[in-house]
């Protein structure tokens, strides 16, 4: 699978650079 950014995106947005939301977890692009 994709590398996990260690961030959740419960609010629908990832703040870690180059990460995207695949609710509820942020993944690196």
Swiss-Prot record:
Disulfide bonds join 5-19, 9-21, 14-26. This is a cyclic peptide. The keyword Disulfide bond applies. InterPro entries: Cyclotide, Cyclotide_sf. One of its GO terms (biological process) is defense response. SUPFAM superfamilies: Cyclotides. Keywords: Disulfide bond, Plant defense. There is a cross-link at residues 1-29 (Cyclopeptide (Gly-Asn)). Belongs to the cyclotide family. The presence of a 'disulfide through disulfide knot' structurally defines this protein as a knottin. Probably participates in a plant defense mechanism. This is Cyclotide mobo-B. It comes from Melicytus obovatus (Hymenanthera obovata).
